[in-house]
């Protein structure tokens, strides 16, 4: 009969072995992640070129990033000198780990720098991430200093590594997605199978017909759709929906899948966030949750400016208030800066007065 003391020592020894294995496993995983992070492009931002407005009190306790998607799907494409057709502001509550995403519509009329009022997506092409961040800061009363940029090829690779996504589709979305798939497949070198259209065509082409399993090419093509009734507002909503699905699947994925995503995607990412900062975030990533998403401006009209149709915030001041309420829980005491007031007046002047604005709010997607 074994002695109690020996049993206790044996049990303690087993626990020590398990702890040692977990520690070694943790070091292995850490090492694997650390080596893969070297694949990410981390250019040094010229901080002297980043302009900010005020640091409003409601931003305390939050971390804010700018996320840019570049409409360039070649693996060898540079992640600069391109229009940022996806512009997302990510606000993170440092205490609750809740993340809120706000898309800035690509055709929004804003000052992209040096009193150049044009579509917001042009800022990145004019001056890279520094100018795009400065536009967000000065036009939306923000203080963003870090960004992440990806191209479409990265999205395709990540979604394929996750095993695809189950996305609800309308007839109109099926038609446009199949059309976009041709170009996306050619430019990424990835294959796809067209979604079979129902016959006969439904009377309401915008009505969701069902959920379809889509691969990377199809999911990215779905994100590019902007010619349904919901126009660009629907496109940005689709993008945020896909991001949410990707986050949920990544949380449930095994470590091998995560490593595969890193191998495929990291070479197609550019960010100002340092490797040390990323490594420090990793232990808490599972606790982050996308709590809500929205689009900016929330209230808008349309106007022809410089022979192009643009989205005009109605008004810029009111929309910035709503944005800060959404991102940071700002109360009625928050008032936009004088820069916002002056920019709003300039926008109204450029469009020829508030009476020239056309209310063509799209149908919700």
Task: Label each PLM-derived region with a short phrase.
Residues 2-97, 280:
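Entry/capping segment at the start of metal-dependent catalytic domains
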Residues 57-59, 160-257:
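Flexible, polar/acidic helix-loop-strand segments at domain edges
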Residues 84-86, 117, 129-137, 152-156, ...:
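Extracytoplasmic/secreted envelope proteins and their assembly/folding machinery
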Residues 74-78, 118-126, 141-146, 209, ...:
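Second-shell loop/turn segments in exported
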Residues 51-55, 62, 112, 256-259, ...:
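C-terminal solvent-exposed extensions
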Residues 58-64, 70, 79-83, 113, ...:
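Solvent-exposed, acidic/flexible segments
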Residues 68, 74, 107, 135-145, ...:
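Structured segments of extracytoplasmic/periplasmic soluble domains
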Residues 60-63, 82-87, 96-104, 115, ...:
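Extracytoplasmic
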